[in-house]
């Protein structure tokens, strides 16, 4: 399982339920990394999608604490154990790299212990955030194995990095 996230300098990921910055190259990378794969996210993240509808061309699994919560054309689970069982029984053909955790902050914190990799768009700017991703640079369980080439969009510098769990 891998996390896919866009963070600012302080590992901020969002404000008022929205991304901090929209970078076309980041959106393209996200589509490339997730199309045809399993994406896992929370209800609040779903509500930020166009029409509050699950992403097309992916297996959508939504984590919610609400036992009566349902979503058309998506699976809903209520805890990591139920999630793992669903993936093992319904989607055995998918490998670990085909399962993507895409947010929001509480889902990242809940599922990061299950992830072996993280694809991180590092934005070289600071924004006013109210949601954060754990700082992998300060976590000894993680190491950065790829620092991507610095790119720029509308005077915002960014790069695509890859972290892997140590051991």
Regions found by a protein language model. Name each.
Residues 1-167:
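Enzymes that bind and transform nitrogen-containing heteroaromatic metabolites
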């Amino acid at each position: 399982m891998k996390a896919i996230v866009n963070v600012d300098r302080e590992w901020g990921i969002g404000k008022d339920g929205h991304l901090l910055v929209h970078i076309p190259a980041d959106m393209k990378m996200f589509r490339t990394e997730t199309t045809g794969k399993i994406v896992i996210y929370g209800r609040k993240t779903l509500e930020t999608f166009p029409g509050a509808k699950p992403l097309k061309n992916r297996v959508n699994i939504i984590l919610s604490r609400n036992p009566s919560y349902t979503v058309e054309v998506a699976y809903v689970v209520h805890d990591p154990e139920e999630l793992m069982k669903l993936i093992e029984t319904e989607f055995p053909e998918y490998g670990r790299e085909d399962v993507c955790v895409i947010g929001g902050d509480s889902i990242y914190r809940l599922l990061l212990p299950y992830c072996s990799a993280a694809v991180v768009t590092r934005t070289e700017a600071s924004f006013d955030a109210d949601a954060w991703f754990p700082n992998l640079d300060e976590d000894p369980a993680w190491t950065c194995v790829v620092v991507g080439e610095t790119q720029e969009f509308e005077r915002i510098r960014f790069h695509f990095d890859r972290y892997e769990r140590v051991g």
